[in-house]
Regions:
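Domain-level signature for soluble enzymes in the chorismate/prephenate branch of the shikimate pathway
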Residues: 1-97
């Protein structure tokens, strides 16, 4: 068993936090790409059915990993809302729903 000091553990958490933010940024970039497809197909920015699929998938994974699925659902709702607001901004619509 490897003994880690509290500083080591905090450093590992900091590394994970950095990775999480980088993954969020990558997710936003892909959402920007999706906006282009939505514009070409004349689709609305918000797609409740797709949002439900994304949240359902996240909740399922959270359950498999023994995580609080309610909290994971809240996190993914925030991620989706962030993407929706960004897509509105890129469309010149500000953050209107």
């Amino acid at each position: 068993m490897v003994f880690m000091t509290i500083e080591n553990v905090r450093q590992e958490i900091e590394n994970i936090d950095r990775e999480l933010v980088e993954l969020i940024a990558k997710r936003v970039e892909f959402a920007d790409d999706i906006l282009k497809y939505k514009h070409q197909a004349n689709l609305p920015i918000n797609d409740d059915r797709q949002n439900d699929v994304v949240i359902g998938r996240a909740v399922s994974i959270a359950t498999e990993k023994g995580l609080d699925s309610t909290m994971v659902k809240q996190i993914f709702n925030l991620l989706i809302q962030m993407n929706i607001e960004r897509q509105h901004e890129l469309s010149g619509e500000g953050n209107l729903p």
